[in-house]
Regions:
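Aromatic- and charge-enriched surface segment that lines or borders ligand/interaction sites
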Residues: 121, 149-194, 217-219, 309, ...
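Gly/Pro-rich hinge or "lid" segments in bacterial periplasmic/extracellular proteins
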Residues: 119, 124-142, 234-298, 303, ...
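Alpha-helical secondary-structure segments
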Residues: 99, 177-184, 213-219, 225, ...
């Protein structure tokens, strides 16, 4: 996928794995050997060897009694989870630097919200610096304690209570208290933050109440199965001491390239942000939750450097030179034809195609239906009939992909969605019905003397091969397509400000569909949200209400299918193609679980899940000097999770 924007409720990292990638030795032609596995320290794989709450309540305020969540709190009558499996690999070791690239420097690092904050980099940084009350296990989807040790859900499913971990601390050393949760909710509701999607979500709650220093209560003002999911798993907890002076408006003004203190395992200092060039994310040595079971084997790299490389082809060359540690392969040509050079053949670079249950995103050309003639569905359908997906998949993409017909994917896809095929004749018929049948001297279609011109925004040159073919298809029928290459930052600004005709977009998938923030009519004419096409439909609005109130997963699935059908038949996107795998190439110097990513993860798992393997690193350095050394290349296609089916709902919390 090209562009990537995410409105997610979760950023889950890590996975359970018994061992790390192969422990054998491969003899080279000289008779010497190079180890292709091993690494990491000897550690127990038994989850019971790692406490859920080490040094429980040791940091509690002695003035707070047990019944108010202080030291000696028993948890009677509360829910918790002390039996979850390990997420990370216990043998992982700390240290080292992971060098990654981003195609453009973001317009803001306001990871908490606000205009133009919904970027892939911000989405990655947020859960590394900030934590929520609870988190989901990425394999079982069970709730796990995070900032809260225990929780309660009322019988009517409207009121939630959380007991905070008295040991939790912000990066500035301040303890996490109930007032921090209250202030964090109020901050997200501040209209000065200019974040309508967040306010749509958090307006479903009344103002939380701090019952004590460590117990907070919140009541939903409407029944919604996702409310517990959002409040416990999405709300980043911030220091109330700072929020007393920093409201939404001040945050937008002063925190474009500065982060508030968080409770997470990493920190981004002001000096780590080099505008236009790089962002360095640093591991904290004083992270309060480092010894908890949920973090065993995770958060291993001392530094994660995000370097700006504005050309993806250049990034590929930098990776081959060893200037970047891995490369997420978006281009099939690179995967099939170009990842076969000597360093790959010798095993110095490993390539993997990883199949798992990560949520399917949406990729396509988005129409701005607020503008003519894109408000006419006949014109939108016509342009969709001019994209020859089958030919492109075969000729350009080596049959690596399949045409996409849905906005949700998996079991949520409506099987009756239109399968729009390449059909220039039908395209011309639809254009004629819409009044585009006359032609000017240049052969262009005209209506009322105006030619049919369209500008398409894109930001990755890797898209140009198929876009130029599409441009030629449109020219043949009399449509002028202007391909406008812009930076990722500029494109994001133009799309969020609704200043476009067509835009080449890629959206990450959500574990639990949240159609409201992409398709609700109330967001259609408001900037800075994911309803970029201006979609409005009263039936969809009704279904969104029904979806929120439905606690039966099977019935929710049917609702999403109906929404999917309505949206697909509105043709607000020219949907492109999809793949059920992730392709990655990496230098053979890392330790990682056998699964590589989590069951529902992708390459963004690497910073938290993988680790520096000093033995491999030393052998790789030697092999780069000695061309006779080789390593096992391993299995390219891996299916560590088999076919586990469509993820359902959390085991606890939504009932």
């Amino acid at each position: 996928m090209r562009a990537a924007s995410y409105t997610g409720i979760l950023a889950l990292v890590g996975t359970l794995s018994a061992a790390c990638g192969g422990g054998g030795q491969a003899p080279n032609e000289q008779g010497t050997t190079a180890s292709n596995g091993g690494g990491g320290s000897s550690a127990s794989a038994d989850k019971n060897a790692y406490p859920v709450f080490p040094d429980a309540d040791s940091g509690a305020d002695p003035a707070v009694p047990a019944e108010q969540g202080g030291r000696g709190f028993t948890g009677n009558g509360w829910d918790t989870n002390s039996n979850y499996d390990l997420v990370g690999e216990p043998r992982a070791t700390k240290g080292g630097v992971l060098r990654q690239h981003i195609l453009d420097f973001p317009g803001t690092l306001r990871v908490l919200g606000g205009p133009e904050s919904n970027t892939a980099l911000n989405f990655m940084i947020k859960p590394m610096v900030y934590e929520t009350l609870l988190t989901l296990h990425p394999t079982t989807l069970q709730w796990m304690p995070q900032l809260a040790t225990h929780w309660q859900i009322s019988e009517d499913r409207l009121t939630y209570r959380f007991r905070l971990d008295p040991n939790a601390r912000f990066s500035d050393g301040q303890p996490v208290v109930a007032e921090d949760v209250v202030a964090s909710w109020a901050f997200m509701m501040d209209k000065g933050l200019q974040d309508p999607s967040s306010q749509l979500v958090y307006s479903k709650f009344d103002r939380p109440v701090a019952e004590s220093k460590y117990i907070v209560r919140v009541k939903s003002n409407q029944l919604n199965w996702r409310n517990f999911l959002y409040f416990s798993g999405d709300l980043s907890v911030l220091p109330s001491s700072l929020l007393k002076t920093v409201d939404g408006a001040r945050y937008l003004k002063e925190y474009n390239f500065k982060l508030m203190p968080g409770t997470g395992p990493y920190i981004v200092n002001d000096t780590d942000i080099v505008k236009g060039q790089s962002v360095t994310i640093r591991r904290r040595n004083d992270y309060w939750g480092a010894k908890q079971r949920r973090n065993v084997g995770l958060n291993n790299f001392d530094e994660i450097r995000q370097v700006v490389v504005r050309d993806d082809n250049l990034a590929f060359e930098m990776f081959k030179r060893g200037d970047l540690d891995h490369y997420f392969v978006n281009v099939s040509r690179q995967w099939i034809e170009e990842l076969n050079f000597p360093d790959v053949q010798r095993g110095l670079i490993q390539k993997r195609k990883i199949f798992n249950d990560s949520p399917t995103g949406t990729q396509g050309l988005a129409f701005n239906t607020r503008k003519e003639p894109w408000s006419d569905i006949r014109v939108r359908r016509a342009l969709a009939h001019l994209l020859n997906r089958e030919m492109l998949i075969q000729k350009l993409f080596y049959n690596e992909y399949v045409p996409q017909h849905t906005y949700f994917g998996g079991a949520y896809e409506n099987p009756g969605n239109p399968k729009t095929a390449y059909d220039p004749k039908r395209a011309l018929e639809l254009l004629a019905e819409a009044g585009w049948k006359e032609r000017d001297a240049q052969g262009r279609l005209v209506k009322a003397g105006r030619p049919l011109n369209v500008e398409l925004l894109y930001y990755s040159k890797t898209s140009e091969p198929f876009l130029t073919i599409y441009q030629e298809e449109l020219r043949r029928v009399g449509i002028s397509l202007n391909l406008r290459l812009v930076t990722g930052e500029t494109m994001f600004q133009l799309v969020m400000q609704r200043r476009f005709d067509l835009a080449a977009m890629g959206w990450g998938g959500l574990l639990f569909p949240n159609p409201e923030t992409s398709w609700h009519s109330s967001l259609a004419d408001v900037n800075d949200n994911n309803n970029i096409t201006g979609f409005k439909d009263t039936r969809v609005d009704e279904l969104l209400v029904a979806y929120d109130r439905e606690f039966d997963q099977a019935k929710r699935l049917e609702i999403i299918r109906e929404i999917d059908g309505i949206v697909a038949n509105a043709h607000h996107y020219i949907l492109e193609w999809d793949a059920p795998f992730h392709r990655i190439a990496y230098w053979n110097k890392f330790g990682h679980p056998d699964s590589y990513f989590t069951r529902i993860g992708d390459y963004r798992d690497m910073p938290s899940l993988w680790w520096r393997d000093q033995q491999k690193e030393a052998q790789l350095a030697q092999a780069r000097r000695d061309s006779s050394m080789t390593f096992a290349v391993g299995t390219t296609e891996v299916r560590p999770w088999g076919n586990l089916g469509e993820p359902g709902a959390p085991v606890s919390g939504t009932r």
